[in-house]
Amino acid sequence: MKVLVAYATRHGATTGIAERVAAALTAAGLSAQARPVEDVKDVEPYDAVVLGGAAYMFHWLKPAVTFARRHRTELAARPVWLFSSGPLGTDLVDKDGKNVLETSRPKEFDELTKLLHPRGEQVFFGAYDPDAPPVGLGERLVQHMPAARNALPAGDFRDWPAIDAWAAQIAAELEAEPRGQ
């Protein structure tokens, strides 16, 4: 079974997650490859798709959303999973007692759930390097505002065991698929 792990990233943390998922699927005996959404013109060669994107301010990166909308017919006809990376820090619960990963779900997932009927979705913690070159006006402004810059915890917060477990779950579901599905 051939699996595409397509992703949209801004600074590379989502690339790392996509590559880890593809490696885990490959280790489970599937043929998987991670590719940026901008490099994928056709999903027809793939039997299943895992689609991921970084999220900023509760919104998935536009290239991931555009990819999902553009390929919605083909994606809805095969097994699909969605993931997002973005929340920073190690706290699983926010100051209001809510699950950080659940409340960080990108707003676009509601629309994409209706369009694509994904088998699952997951939000993972992301990474932030305050010394990375800024992308876009918003990031340039944050870099020049010390209070805003210091409000974001710096570091790599990706939970590799959680990512591996999610990929293993996908692999198990795909291995249980009747061939030709």
Which residues are covered by each model-predicted region?
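N-terminal beta1-alpha1 ligand-phosphate binding loop
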Residues: K2-A28
